[in-house]
């Protein structure tokens, strides 16, 4: 499945802000190509946190590795995302949001991070700010799709719309665009399944 969709699929299922697996040396959805050094730091942090997340010292070590990655490459999306996820897991929602906003100061149109930050705002009770972030995410998912025709951007655009408008309107919009988004029946079935998951998941589940 497309890495960009996994980024937000796992996000709205509240498992993590990024794919759980470590990253290979590939460009991210924003087009940034990180140096291999920072990828190694990120992957080390993921490994430490994945295997020893119950240890305060290991959590601290993972955070230190991610901070080093961010210091070396301030545009490295996954390091910010993992740091925000680990802070969230420690109950530090405000710091998690600050981490995503630090990335967005440098990359204000990156929709996957906008969507994640919007969910944090809503979880913290700031629904108005959350809606603004969802809207910005929706607009930029559309922009990215028009640029590279990556189907994942459009599926995630429907997720942003669902958060703003609710499932009924989102379903109607998807049905109107369903055929345009799929080049074949197999792709259409995959899209249908992904969108139905978005539509049928209760909103409160997104905010747990």
Residue map of PLM features:
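N-terminal leader/linker segments that initiate helical-solenoid repeat arrays
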Residues: 20-72
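Terminal, low-structured helical/coil segments at or just beyond the last alpha-helical repeat
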Residues: 25-30, 160-208
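Residue-level recognition of tetratricopeptide repeat
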Residues: 46, 85, 119, 159-160
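Structural signature of tandem alpha-helical TPR/SEL1-like repeats
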Residues: 54-65, 90-102, 126-136, 166-169
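Canonical positions in the second alpha-helix
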Residues: 68-69, 102-103, 137, 144, ...
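TPR alpha-solenoid repeat register
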Residues: 79, 113, 147, 153-154, ...
């Amino acid at each position: 499945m497309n890495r960009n969709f996994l980024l937000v699929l796992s996000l709205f299922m509240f498992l993590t802000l990024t794919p759980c697996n470590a990253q290979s040396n590939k460009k991210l959805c924003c087009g940034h190509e990180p140096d291999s050094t920072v990828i190694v730091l990120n992957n080390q942090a993921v490994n430490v946190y994945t295997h020893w997340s119950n240890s305060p010292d290991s959590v601290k070590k993972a955070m230190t590795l991610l901070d080093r990655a961010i210091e070396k490459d301030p545009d490295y999306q996954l390091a910010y995302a993992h740091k925000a996820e680990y802070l969230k897991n420690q109950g530090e929602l405000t710091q998690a949001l600050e981490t995503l906003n630090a990335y967005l100061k440098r990359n204000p149109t990156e929709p996957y991070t906008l969507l994640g930050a919007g969910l944090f705002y809503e979880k913290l009770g700031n629904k108005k700010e959350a809606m603004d972030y969802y809207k910005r995410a929706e607009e930029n998912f559309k922009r990215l799709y028009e640029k590279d025709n990556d189907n994942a951007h459009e599926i995630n655009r429907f997720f942003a719309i669902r958060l703003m408008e609710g499932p009924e309107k989102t379903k109607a919009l998807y049905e109107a665009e369903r055929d345009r988004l799929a080049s074949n029946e197999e792709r259409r079935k995959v899209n249908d399944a992904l969108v139905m998951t978005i539509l049928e998941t209760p909103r409160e589940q997104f905010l747990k």
